[in-house]
């Protein structure tokens, strides 16, 4: 497995992640950069995009999805609640091809992603863990958490979601890769993030 960190377009510079499996299949976590940036990275790796996994439906995480789906025919996964229409940039049903598996596990080649439903920033937000990594979208940030004042947001649900993440059976060394800003570890967030224990709500 190889993973590349690719920034989305200005001014939000969303963190997106392109994973190349041993079989040269590309898995994209969120899609906020120009489509050509991802296609170039895939070409340089000799890989084909097969899956896009979306942490939630806000425009700054899905901007390249339609173009990439058209170019590659890849599968696109999003929680059905957010799939009803992403904020400011609706994605039509023909683009959003798949819901998360009923058992909340998705295996692609040698990788198995565990899906955690974490509403709060949006009603359909998810976090994904795989191979010692936690892709936390706009739920958990380094030292903070996602906003809850957008349509579909909820402080109460965010508090529950952050408590869920704090109690996950994942080691402290798990690397937290959020949708914006810098990276962290789950142990660091458990011990220092004031939003992780629910006391703020």
List PLM regions with ranges.
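Conserved beta-strand hairpin/beta-sheet module of binuclear metal-dependent hydrolase folds
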Residues: 1-45, 127-137
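Short Gly/Pro-enriched turn/cap motifs at secondary-structure boundaries
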Residues: 7-9, 97, 117-119
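Active-site HxH/HxHxD metal-binding segment of metal-dependent hydrolases
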Residues: 11, 33-111, 194-195
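Core dinuclear metal-dependent hydrolase active-site scaffold
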Residues: 18, 104-129
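Metallo-beta-lactamase
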Residues: 91, 117, 122-201
